[in-house]
Amino acid sequence: MLDAFAKVVAQADARGEFLSNTQIDALLAIVSEGNKRLDVVNKITNNASAIVTNAARALFAEQPQLISPGGNAYTSRRMAACLRDMEIVLRYVSYAMIAGDASVLDDRCLNGLRETYQALGTPGASVAVAIQKMKDAALALVNDTTGTPAGDCASLVAEIATYFDRAAAAVA
């Protein structure tokens, strides 16, 4: 995983050049939105348990067969594994958000996840629905500006939405 700064430096170094004005401007934009990015990650981190729990409840209300005998989330052990996996995805989405880059999400969470779920018989479509529900909850939190400094966070909202969409597509 390389953050935006490391990527820019690595690219310039590979070419044996100084950073261009365009690259410097891009890095300045990242710095200027840094506090907003931290606010987004803090909201998700501070509400992670509720995001995961409420998404799971909504999923199981829509798909009760998952928690019925023989379902993929039936028994407390399987339910715990489901909640753990949802929390891991949410955590890596927050890592991608703070880094401003999806590679940490891809490399450490999503690569091979679909194949793992297929091997375990876990319905990827249901996991994708759970991720969508976490996305909806996270976006509602991020869009709630109560108690946070005013500022346009539309680009960050769109960015975090893409990380959730990427995760859902990876398992579907």
From Swiss-Prot:
Localization per Swiss-Prot or TrEMBL: Plastid, Chloroplast thylakoid membrane
Post-translational note: Contains one covalently linked phycocyanobilin chromophore and one covalently linked phycoerythrobilin chromophore.
Membrane topology designation: Peripheral membrane protein
Record's keyword annotation contains Membrane: yes
Keywords, sorted A to Z: Antenna complex, Bile pigment, Chloroplast, Chromophore, Electron transport, Membrane, Methylation, Photosynthesis, Phycobilisome, Plastid, Thylakoid, Transport
Residues that bind (2R,3E)-phycoerythrobilin: 35, 39, 149-151, 153
InterPro entries: Globin-like_sf, Phycobilisome_asu/bsu, Phycobilisome_asu/bsu_sf, Phycocyanin_b
UniProt xrefs under CDD domains: PC_PEC_beta
GO cellular component: chloroplast thylakoid membrane; phycobilisome
Keyword Cell membrane included in the entry's annotation: no
Job description of the protein: Light-harvesting photosynthetic tetrapyrrole chromophore-protein from the phycobiliprotein complex (phycobilisome, PBS). Phycocyanin is the major phycobiliprotein in the PBS rod.
The name this protein goes by in its record: R-phycocyanin beta chain
Organism listed in the record: Polysiphonia urceolata (Red alga)
Lineage, uppermost ranks: Eukaryota, Rhodophyta, Florideophyceae, Rhodymeniophycidae, Ceramiales
